[in-house]
């Protein structure tokens, strides 16, 4: 194996031509060697390719010690192999040295003490084995039968069975030597063997009935029928009713069914072809008797050998014992289940007898001749009701009761009481342990209208509530009598000596029917034909099947109640959602001065759980009012696809609707939805007043307006090296600013109600907005940019705090800012920058920690995938929105006045990287690739103030006094806002201890801003309790930005010299 593998490795992978494989002297090899035809050449190539495919990998060879591992040198591997060989050699040498000599082996009786030659010893050993085999065969042939074992008290049976055996021994035929048998060597435990030979025995013999144990040794089967040798396809021939009524009852106590193998016998006579099976020329496979060998050329011949009297007597005794067991089981079944018989069986006597005669006569045997041979009767012992207390009974009485019920009598008194307790319970409740019922089936093979009664006795579980059914085939009536047995019911009927070769089809049908019947079909009257005083029936008793049905009905009712409760809860939740929707619409209508289209929420109970929390106005903004507009949101087909990929379970989404405040002069609005995924394994959002926080699983989206002479329209593209979603999303927008961000509802540990909803559609009918191409797929929220006129709440009051751990999934991508593509305006577009952060949790699992692509490559990827959706995960940008709303409200920032112009193409805007520390941001995103439109497009409005200089001055604490800043109208809470801004400036500029990243102080670089520059805010990745630094990148348009991977441990090296230090050093 090792050599072959080495040869396989040495084989070159390329295929040589056959001219190269053959010797160089053959100039025309294919003509001279005719065996190298094209077919053989192809087969050799296939063989070579198969060998190359099947050779073991290097890992397997390393595991098997054939090749050295990659991590260790080859010399070390060879040294290890040599050491192992030396150790094995030493071990073998030691064993050889320490082995005992021949005298020691003779003394230990391992070797025989003889001086004979080895060949002679082998001959003697063969002779000894042959002699032992002969002795064994003789003992097997003369082994005692079950009757002899019972007589010698070797087999434990009941007294009644012993009496029946002694009585029935007088009827044994004396001319058994003239009979010949053909026996299967596979014993009676294989019910698959078809009884392909019609065997007919003498009518005067009660023991020639061939029965067998089916797959369970307890479920024995008797068939009451009289067969007539006829080529008709009828399985059963009619049995006159007079025969059943004139037979003397033979009743005996049930014997314990033993698991011993009982050989299966068949008297063999002339074989008549009655079906296709018997006409099949194939010989029977299992025809060997014991160790008899039949050569293959003689297997098709019919070999009839006479058996000795010992073997015939053995088989006859087996038949007789099996019959007695079957009769005893039937009797015990009828005595224990007499209370389940219906009212037409009028007699209630305790003495129960039953016709259990088995008759298998040949063609000319009349019914009277069959019934004459069954005159042997044993007086039946009655099984009365058990007393209330079994403990007071003596052991002998307990054993007698057990014998009457066919149960084992061995064991202690407590064991006996435990065996009798089910009968005591059933007798007190009036319910029998098993019941014999009848079900009718149709046999398509029957052509006659006569009735033949077939009684199959099958086993049922003690204390089982499922009854044993009895079936009838066509007009042939079949009774199944349930017997008490600790084994499960195995309803496969045994083969009978009067079955034809087609009868096994019927037995299979019985087995299927018994396993497929429902308990409701079992409640039929029994068709047993008995004498008038043979059975006692107590009307009004409840059989076990009713108990089972009641239990099933109760379980079904409980399940229906649970379903009704769930439906009721779902309806309540849907009603609550409708009420909240109506309240939201009423608030919009009451506060709205400019008409907007309504918000459509399409509810589906399969995707999310919705909770909308209404919050009142902030205390510092109580005097101001704001009209509420609608933000354009759409989650289309591609969004649903990404939801199905990213969301494993139903996510509970909490939507907290805050009523924001604005000045009454402005018509626009900020709608804020707090979307929270109720997945608990992540850390909670812990926000502080005057702190700018974002969770690890959030994105911070910051819309900034920048005044520029040649303003450009920037849109965000997140380019990552993994899969893209090429489906374009066109989002309808309206004249409103909608900010969707991921946060935790304050002081809320679990949602009180959860309503399921699907991604909802907020239809607006003004503009069509097309998202920029992105390298990752996700759900998209797009927002139109309109003038932001007032801050909704104060900065400290608007921060959400929660102690609940939140886990954000890639639920929706949030995009702030103008992204419309198909509009024409007259003025240059506003420069809009998106600051996006994303945690590695949102990145695709295929993303690996490697150096990101260059900026130019990322732009090429973005251009090559123009139809893919931008994925921006749910943003926790409440704090940033509040910060810039405060700046706008205080007049230090100019609001975005109008919707910028659409663009038909996106072009990249390069950026510089610089770092500005802010001590309150705790998470870092992957970098975003920004694409800008051509600078020649017009916009409806130009901004009057550059946002970069504003933000730089604000962060440096040198905000201008408003000379170049158009202030908005301020209201009564301007003083609070200004004090809040001062506090924020102090926090941003004073805490230098929190500005260190990995124990390295950071320097704040003041970078001049140009007209075409863009602002990018990157947040460091850390835990919630570690306040790290905030990176502000102020790039020039002529430089390039290298994107960052979301899985890197940190973003930059900590010391940058200037703003042109673009090629970052990765840690």
From Swiss-Prot:
PROSITE patterns: RPEL, SAP. This is Myocardin-related transcription factor B. It holds the Pfam family SAP. The N-terminal region is required for nuclear localization and the C-terminal region mediates transcriptional activity. GO terms for biological process: positive regulation of transcription by RNA polymerase II; smooth muscle cell differentiation. Its main location: nucleus. Residues 540-594 form a coiled coil. GO terms for cellular component: nucleus. It is found in: Nucleus. PANTHER family: MYOCARDIN-RELATED TRANSCRIPTION FACTOR B (PTHR22793:SF5), MYOCARDIN-RELATED TRANSCRIPTION FACTOR-RELATED (PTHR22793). RPEL repeats lie at residues 46-71, 90-115, 134-159.
């Amino acid at each position: 194996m090792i050599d072959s593998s080495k040869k396989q490795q040495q084989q070159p992978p390329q295929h040589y031509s056959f001219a190269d494989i053959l010797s160089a002297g053959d100039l025309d090899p294919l003509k001279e060697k005719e065996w190298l035809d094209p077919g053989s050449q192809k087969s050799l190539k296939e063989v070579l390719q198969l060998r190359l495919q099947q050779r073991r990998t290097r890992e397997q060879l390393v595991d098997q010690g054939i090749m050295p591992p990659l991590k260790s040198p080859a010399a070390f591997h060879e040294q290890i192999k040599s050491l192992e060989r030396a150790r094995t050699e030493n071990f073998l040498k030691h064993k050889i040295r320490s082995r005992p000599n021949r005298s020691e082996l003779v003394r230990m009786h391992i070797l025989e003490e003889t001086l004979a030659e080895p060949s002679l010893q082998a001959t003697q050993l063969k002779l000894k084995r042959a002699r032992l085999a002969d002795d064994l065969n003789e003992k097997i042939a003369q082994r005692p039968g079950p009757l002899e074992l019972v007589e010698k008290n070797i087999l434990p049976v009941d007294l009644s069975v012993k009496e029946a055996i002694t009585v029935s021994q007088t009827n044994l035929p004396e001319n058994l030597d003239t009979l010949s048998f053909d026996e299967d060597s596979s014993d009676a435990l294989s019910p698959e063997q078809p009884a392909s030979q019609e065997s007919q025995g003498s009518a005067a013999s009660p023991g020639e009935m061939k029965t067998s144990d089916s797959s369970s040794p307890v479920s024995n089967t008797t068939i009451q029928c009289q067969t007539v040798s006829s080529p008709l396809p009828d399985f059963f021939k009619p049995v006159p009713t007079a025969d059943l009524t004139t037979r003397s009852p033979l009743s005996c106590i049930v014997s314990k069914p033993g698991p011993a193998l009982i050989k299966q016998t068949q008297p063999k006579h002339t074989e008549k072809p009655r079906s296709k099976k018997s006409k099949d020329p194939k010989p029977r496979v299992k025809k060997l008797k014991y160790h008899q060998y039949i050569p293959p050329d003689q297997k098709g011949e019919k070999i009839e050998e006479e058996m000795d009297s010992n073997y015939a007597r053995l088989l006859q005794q087996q038949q007789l014992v099996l019959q007695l067991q079957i009769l005893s089981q039937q009797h015990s079944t009828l005595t224990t289940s007499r209370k389940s018989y219906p009212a037409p069986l009028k007699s209630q006597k305790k003495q129960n007898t039953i016709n259990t005669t088995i008759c298998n006569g040949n063609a000319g045997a009349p019914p009277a001749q069959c019934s004459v041979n069954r005159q042997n009767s044993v007086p039946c012992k009655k099984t009365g009701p058990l007393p209330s207390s079994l403990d007071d009974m003596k052991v002998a009485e307990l054993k007698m009761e057990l014998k009457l019920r066919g149960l084992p009598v061995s064991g202690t008194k407590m064991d006996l009481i435990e065996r009798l307790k089910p009968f005591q319970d059933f007798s007190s409740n009036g319910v029998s342990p098993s019941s014999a019922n009848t079900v009718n089936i149709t046999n398509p093979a029957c052509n006659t209208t006569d009735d033949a009664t077939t009684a199959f006795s099958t086993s049922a579980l003690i204390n089982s509530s499922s009854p044993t059914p009895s079936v009838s085939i066509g007009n042939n009536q079949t009774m199944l009598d349930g017997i008490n047995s600790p084994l499960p019911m195995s309803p496969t009927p045994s083969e009978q000596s009067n079955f034809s070769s087609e009868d096994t089809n019927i037995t299979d049908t019985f087995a299927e029917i018994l396993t497929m019947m429902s308990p409701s079909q079992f409640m039929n009257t029994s068709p047993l034909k008995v004498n008038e005083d043979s059975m006692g029936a107590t009307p009004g008793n409840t059989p076990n099947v009713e108990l089972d049905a009641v239990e099933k009905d109760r379980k079904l009712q409980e399940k229906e109640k649970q379903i009704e409760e769930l439906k009721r809860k779902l309806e309540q939740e849907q009603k609550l959602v409708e009420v909240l929707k109506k309240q939201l619409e009423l608030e919009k209508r009451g506060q709205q001065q400019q008409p907007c289209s309504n918000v459509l929420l399409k509810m589906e109970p399969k995707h999310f759980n919705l909770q909308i929390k209404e919050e009142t106005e902030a205390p510092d903004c109580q005097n101001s009012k704001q009209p509420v507009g609608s933000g354009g949101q759409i989650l289309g087909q591609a969004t649903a696809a990404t939801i199905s990929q990213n969301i494993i379970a139903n996510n509970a989404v909490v939507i907290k609707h805050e009523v924001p405040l604005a000045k009454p002069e402005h018509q626009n609005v900020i709608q804020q939805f707090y979307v929270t995924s109720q997945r608990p394994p992540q850390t909670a959002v812990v926000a502080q007043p005057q702190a700018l926080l974002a969770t690890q699983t959030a994105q911070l989206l910051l819309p900034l307006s920048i005044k520029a002479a040649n303003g450009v329209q920037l849109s965000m593209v997140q380019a990552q090296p993994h899969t893209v979603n090429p489906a374009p999303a066109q989002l309808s927008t309206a004249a409103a600013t909608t900010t969707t961000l991921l946060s935790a509802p304050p002081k809320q540990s679990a949602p009180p109600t959860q309503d399921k909803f699907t991604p909802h559609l907020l239809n607006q009918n003004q503009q069509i907005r097309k998202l920029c191409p992105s390298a990752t797929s996700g759900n998209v929220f797009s927002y139109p940019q309109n003038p932001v006129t007032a801050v909704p709440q104060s900065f400290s009051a608007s921060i959400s705090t929660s102690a609940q751990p939140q886990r954000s999934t890639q639920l929706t991508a949030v995009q702030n800012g103008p992204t419309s593509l198909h509009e024409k305006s007259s003025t240059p577009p506003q420069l809009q920058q998106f600051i996006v952060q994303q945690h590695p949790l949102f990145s695709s699992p295929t993303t690996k920690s490697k150096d990101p692509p260059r900026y130019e490559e990322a732009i090429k990827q973005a251009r090559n995938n123009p139809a893919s959706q931008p994925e921006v995960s749910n943003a926790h940008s409440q704090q940033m929105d509040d910060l810039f709303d405060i700046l706008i409200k205080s007049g230090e920032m100019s609001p975005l006045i109008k919707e910028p112009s659409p663009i038909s193409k996106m072009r990249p805007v390069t950026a510089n990287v610089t770092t500005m520390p802010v001590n309150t941001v705790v998470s870092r995103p992957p970098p975003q690739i920004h694409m800008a439109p051509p600078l020649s497009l017009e916009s409806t409005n130009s901004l009057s103030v550059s946002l970069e200089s504003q933000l730089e001055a604000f962060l440096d604490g040198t905000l201008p006094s408003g000379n170049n800043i158009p202030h908005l109208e301020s209201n009564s809470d301007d003083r609070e806002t200004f004090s809040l801004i001062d506090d924020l400036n102090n926090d941003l500029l004073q805490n230098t201890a929190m500005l260190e990243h990995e124990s390295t102080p950071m320097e704040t670089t003041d970078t001049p801003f140009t007209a075409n520059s863009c602002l990018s805010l990157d947040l460091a990745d850390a835990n919630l309790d570690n306040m790290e630094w905030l990176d502000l990148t102020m790039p020039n348009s002529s430089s390039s930005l290298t994107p960052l991977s979301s899985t890197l441990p940190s973003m930059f090296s900590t010391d940058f010299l200037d703003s042109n230090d673009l090629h970052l050093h990765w840690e």
